[in-house]
A protein has these predicted regions:
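Basic, helix-initiating cap at the start of DNA-binding domains
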Residues: 1-32, 36-40
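Solvent-exposed, amphipathic alpha-helical segments
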Residues: 16, 20-28, 70, 74-78, ...
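Helix-turn-helix
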Residues: 24-58, 62
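Hydrophobic alpha-helical connector segments
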Residues: 75-107
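C-terminal peripheral helix-coil segments that are non-catalytic and often amphipathic
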Residues: 134-138, 150, 169-199
């Protein structure tokens, strides 16, 4: 596959394709999105598209990966290691991370409330399984492959993804901080207790 045209910078075109796909995922089924419509919207040629992505399915995965705020759970795990676990917005750095990831969080909420909810749930869980769950095992000195860890993980992520979809359903009537205040620290602490007691 040939390289993109000289006037199409690598980072710029790839990012524009990802942003365009993320917007499409909010409004229409991923299966309905075509390469032709995407390259017309972004203003690149077909060769450029295939230089970066094998197909629209791979682009959809990249678009979802781009809006998963993995920095936030990683920061929370860091607090676990320090013995100061909290989901409260008053916790140092957490408000900054929420603000920094605000656009991506809003996009993910909207996708989870749209025609690609199942696709988004599957991809987000996979990212968290790969990037966050292993760190949780290290923090708690536990085996993340055991049934208890997976059950708690599925329960926690399923609930959070449902809340994100609900936030979009309300027309984004509530800021992320409202959900954090409501859940913390009791809910995450209770789940951590389950993992600690049954590992």
């Amino acid at each position: 596959m040939g390289r993109p045209r000289k006037d199409e910078t690598t980072q710029d075109v790839r990012e524009r394709l990802i942003v365009a796909m993320a917007d499409r995922l909010i409004r229409e089924p991923a299966s309905a999105v075509t390469v032709t419509s995407l390259i017309k919207e972004v203003g690149c040629n077909r060769s450029t598209f295939y230089y970066y992505f094998a197909d629209t399915e791979q682009l959809a995965e990249a678009a979802l990966d781009a809006v998963v705020p993995v920095e936030i759970p990683r920061a929370l795990l860091s607090l676990i290691r320090q013995g100061a676990f909290s989901l409260s917005p008053a916790t140092p750095n957490i408000p900054d991370l929420v603000q920094r990831n605000a656009q991506g969080i809003d996009t993910l909420c909207a996708v989870l409330n749209g025609p690609n909810a199942a696709l988004a749930q599957k991809r987000v869980k996979r990212r968290l399984l790969e990037d966050v769950l292993p760190d949780l095992g290290v923090s708690l000195s536990s085996n993340t492959d055991d049934p208890t860890s997976r059950i708690v993980f599925e329960y926690a992520t399923g609930g959070l993804l449902a809340l994100m979809a609900y936030r979009a359903e309300t027309g984004f009537a509530y800021p992320v901080e409202t959900f954090l205040h409501c859940l913390a620290p009791e809910v995450p602490a209770a789940l951590l207790d389950v993992l600690s007691e049954k590992r």
